[in-house]
Structures are given as structure tokens and as C-alpha cells.
Amino acid sequence: MRQSREELIKRGVLKEIFDKDGELSIPNEEGALENGQPLGSGQVLSSSQVSLPALAELESGSAPGEPCSYEVLPTTEITDGTVSEESPTSNESGVLLSQDPTAKPVLLLPPKKSAAFPGDHEDTPVKQLSLLKQPPALPPKPIARIASHLTDPGAPVKLPCMPVKLSPPLPPKKVMICMPLGGPDLSSLSSYSTQKSSQQPLTQHHHTVLPSQLAAHQHQLQYGSHSQHLPSGSSTLPIHPSGCRMIEELNKTLAMTMQRLESSGLHTGDNVTKTGPGGLPDMRQVPTVVIECDDNKENVPHEADYEDSSCLYPRQEEEEEEDEDEDNSLFTSSLAMKVCRKDSLAIKLSNRPSKRELEEKNILPMQTDEERLELRQQIGTKLTRRLSQRPTAEELEQRNILKPRNEQEEQEEKREIKRRLTRKLSQRPTVEELRERKILIRFSDYVEVADAQDYDRRADKPWTRLTAADKAAIRKELNEFKSSEMEVHELSRHLTRFHRP
């Protein structure tokens, strides 16, 4: 069931924008290519050529039951000129879905120079343009066949959709779709894609977009303004990003989603059978979005990376399980660790080689007793040589390190020292002088001080000449004196010391 253009415009799928004078204008992009060749600067397509009859031919050319295909304008319209339409909000070119849910996306070449022509029909929808690009360095793709058909001014050329497989992904079609910031809102696009997928009878060649992927595309449309890709109901086209950093991130996410889909069992082969809303099994394929950057193609991963990624994740899970087992085994007590350390040290010490083993392995040199004696003699000769090199006393005297000595000078030095000492002793003060100066304050008063004659104490030693009998008589006399004549207190008599007889 087709819907009219007015209903689609009301729903927000199509936009109809007019200038003040009723003219339709589209922002142009410089360097527009037609299969790699630049367009002429004077080629302009009038609005009368892109009118309701041309659109009717495009709609009638594709039946709803036919396989998915891309439709290109006839060469008469392409070579004569291009349609230009300018939006009051933004000058960026965008993607506009076709006016019919069963119609196929129409790919229009962007013009080289912007031109505005009065539109005869006010109800003509805004056909915003996309770019067909084919770099010469890459191998020929299915879109490369457009060049041969564009020369024929016949019916519009149809390109069948290539079935997309998950591993390895097919080489991408060189079609770039630029999405403006102020383009159609996401809700209208999602509703359009779901409506088209539910209304069309799907065949093997059709592949729709899953709701999870549609949500992912909406998230990328919200947060990634430079790298934006729009999933349509019949095909998914690669997008040309402005930066190569986004390419690497999107390729990583694609590889992860492919692996998760394979591991979850959603894909048993190239196609997946699911029951539709009417109970009929519909064959669907999850499309693969491959993004290529022509400025820097070295960052794009190879197809072998996608094939090898399937065998990486089970190995990583096994390694993680082994690491967890090792971590659990290491949770032992500190006492056990100490015991292990002591045991390991004891084992290492017991395994130390002996001196003989080291000598056999030539680690330690073999030494006999004679060799040891020779080494000691060599060390002794070195020491004696060093000691013999010490300077003599005469050399030290010559260097004024040692002073020369004479016997007469030494005796005179000794005499001078004695004179100093006697002078100091003769100048000592008496006890009375010390009391007057209050130096001997603690000196006891009951001590009687008597002047004695000066004599040499060392000269007179009578006790050295006493015999044993004289000593015995002296001891006997002392004992008798202490026992009879000396006054002793009765309580301290036992403390009296008597000499042995």
C-alpha cells in the first residue's frame, strides 16, 4: 500500500522547502565526480526535468515485489545539469528518503555550481543529493558498471543489492552519504524504516536493520556529527567520515558486535530465519557497515582481522579463568609463607657446592701448600719493601720533622723542670694563711699543728734495719700497753686490735 507524498510530508519523512520567489535551490559541493570524472561547470539540470512525470517514471519502474536495487537518474538528466536546492537552515547536503515506502533510494549526483530555477510544481519534494564516488586505485566494484549504462539515455539503471555476509565482509560500495546536522529527525527515520520493513514482503535479497542496530545508529547520529551513517530499509551504505580516528573506533565496535552476534547463536549461516508479524518466516541478514577513509587507508583493518577475531575471545576467557585459579591458590597464611621461605633457603644452602666441586669446575683455582707459601712470601716481600721505603731519623731531622738531640741539652732541660717544682713547693702557704684566706674552713679545730724540723724522710729508715726478735718485742710491748694502760670503753673493748705475738 503506497502513501501519498502529502502524508509523507506530514509525517516528517519528506521535507518541502520553498524560497520567497518559489524557487528550489540545493547547496552545491565543489569537485562533484561522475564515476571519478569531474562534471562540467556549465551543466545544469532544470527543475522542469525533475518534475512529477520523472518521479512517476521512477516510481513505476520499480515494483514492490522486485529485489532491492539502487536507482540512478537517466543520463539525459545527469548530463544536462543538476538540481540545486538551498535550505534556509543549513547549507549542508543531506540524505532524504524516497517518497514511497516501497520505492528505492534514488542516488543523485551533486552539482558543481549552485543554480536556482523557478519550480513549475510547488508540490515537488526536496531531493537532496548524494555522491557516487569511485577511486581509481581500488578493484572494480558493482557500482563501477554505472559508467557504461549512463551513456545510454534509456530507462533508469538499477543496481541489485549484494547480499552482505558477516565474515569476511564484502568490499564496500564507494557511495558516500553526507548527513546534515539539521536533517530529518531520528524518530521519523526510525518509524519509516520499521514501516517499510513491515509492509514489504521480504525475499532472500532483502536485508533489514535490526532494532538494536537502529538504536546504535541513532546513538551515533546524536553524538558523532562527523561520522554519521543512516540505515535504510533496503540497504546500508558506507559513510565517509571526516576524521580517521572515528574509523578505528567504529571498526573496533563492528568487530565486537559481529563476534557477539556469532557467539550468541543469532546467526547459523549467512541468513537467519525469524517469524514476522504475520507468522511467515522472513530471511534477514544483518548488514555490515564498512567505513573507508580515502585520505588515510592504512588505518583500515584487513579482512583477515575479522576472521581471526572469532578465535581470540575463547582464549582470553580461558586465560582469565587460569589467572583467577592462580590468584585463589596464592591466598595462603603468612606462617605458611614463612615456612616456605625457610624451606627454600635450607634447600638452597644444602645445594651449595663444596670447595672441591668448585675447584673441579675451575671456579676456584687449585692451590697446593707450596703455592700458598709462595703467595705468603710474595706478600711479605711487598710489606718489607714498603717498610724499607720509610724515611730514617736523619732524613726526618733534615726535613725538620724530628729535632736533633744532645746529652748536655737533655740534662739541662731536666734541671730546669726540678727548679720549677721546688719553687712551687716553697711558695706553698701555711695552714694559718689558709685559714685567714678562709680556704681551710672545714679543717678541724682540735687538730694540733706543730712545727717539725725539716729532714729527709727517705734517708732515715730504722725499721728497715730491725731483726725478727726486735719486731717480736715491739709487738709484745704494744699488746701489753693496749690491754693494761690504754683506756678503752667497756662496750668497745672487743674492737681492740692486738698484734700477733
Curated annotation (Swiss-Prot):
Residues 295-304, 392-415 have a biased composition (Basic and acidic residues). Pfam families: RPEL. GO terms for biological process: actin cytoskeleton organization; actomyosin structure organization; cell motility; stress fiber assembly. Residues 317-328 have a biased composition (Acidic residues). GO terms for cellular component: cytosol; nucleus; synapse. Keywords: Actin-binding, Cytoplasm, Nucleus, Protein phosphatase inhibitor, Repeat, Synapse. It is found in: Cytoplasm; Synapse; Nucleus. RPEL repeats lie at residues 1-18, 343-368, 381-406, 419-444. Belongs to the phosphatase and actin regulator family. This is Phosphatase and actin regulator 1. It comes from Gallus gallus (Chicken). The lineage of its organism: Eukaryota, Metazoa, Chordata, Craniata, Vertebrata.
